[in-house]
Amino acid sequence: MATTAEKRTAQSLRICLFSALYRPSMGGVETYTESLARALYEMGAEVTVATCNTHGLAAREREDGVNVVRFPCKPLLGGRFPLVKNDEEAKRLWAHLEDDHFDYVIANTRFYTLTERALDFATRAGVVPLLIEHGSAHLTMGSTLIDPVVQAVEHALTKRDMRYPFVAYAVSRKASAWLGHFGIESAGELPNSIDADAYVAQASARDFRAERGIPSDALMVAFAGRLVPEKGVVELAQATAAIAEHPDANGRAVHLIIAGAGSKQGDIERIGCGNIHLVGRLGRQDLAALMSQADAMALPSRSEGFATTLLEAAACATPAIVTPVGGTDELVSNERFGTIIPNARAETVEAALREAARNPQRLAEQGENVARRVRAEYSWRRTAERALSACRKANEK
């Protein structure tokens, strides 16, 4: 329980969280920022989220007790990389933030232009900000021609960030290690988290197995995320199709439900397998229903800071089949809690899916174990308390 002094301090604090992407955009950073903001607000702080206006919404409003300030921007790469403008509206919004006299500033993710502006804003206000890392590998567009350019830009923008004083944290141990690639030392982790019971309770009444005509004895595997190269979703679909074409004599059929949208949807559709079910981007309630009903969640991703879907599946006692990306060290530390595969090649994923189909009892045990762990160690209240402690430490006089 928080002491009286801690409660008083939290209730008097003004905190600004910067995140280039925020709802209604969907993604791990967006969910992290929203959840941390809500947890800090519930602890009594006055919280503002400063973001880029990628969807043409109001420049300023209050959502569920949290102030939201949206800067005008140019939404490049389909909105994934917004460039903050410096027009008259932007200047008015910066002046508004300056008038709030924030005690603490937290910036999410390197390399966005809003992040650089956030670090400059904090420095001019006399605040040492936290910079939270959300990745564990370079950004990728899935192109051998474009990716080297993207990496060079990422390094250049990170160097610009490093001109300012900040204290770096990360959402997982792998993300902390990745900061070292840029010559940045991590002070520790402020992990991605989930309010597990609340997540499960919000599930809708949709029955995905019935909707898609999936037999009750089939292994139902869920994937949730952007359909882009780095998520490994095409390889996952190829693995599912290979099992459908050459089923095990004693194994269950494997059906894959893919929730999400993105550039690789056409590639998945062209595989032409009846055991692959594309259901589009799902709302939170429907996604919780899918995770609760699935026998396993697959995430053969190239890079994750600490995948939100990993936490969502764990909350639902659904074990993961996942590559060793950020968050697996903590949540899926060994095969008692899920299945770690060494790479995202289709044949590797296929072998893991076949093994899962042959061992339903092991899947159930993994699900029970990871559900207990996520409830014991990964609540948003706990991460918010760590964030406050980190802010205080960074700004000790």
Predicted regions, residues:
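Conserved donor-binding/catalytic core segment of Leloir-type glycosyltransferases
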Residues: 169, 215-231, 237-241
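Conserved acidic donor-binding segment of nucleotide-sugar-dependent glycosyltransferases
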Residues: 334-335, 339-346, 355-360
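Carbohydrate-associated surface elements
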Residues: 53, 174, 193
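Nucleotide-sugar donor phosphate/pyrophosphate-binding loop at the beta->alpha transition
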Residues: 128, 137-161, 169-170, 177
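Nucleotide-activated donor-binding/catalytic signature segment of Leloir-type glycosyltransferases, i.e.
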Residues: 266-285
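Short alpha-helical donor nucleotide-sugar binding micro-motif in glycosyltransferases
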Residues: 281-282, 289-294
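Short hydrophobic beta-strand element within catalytic cores of glycosyltransferases
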Residues: 319-322
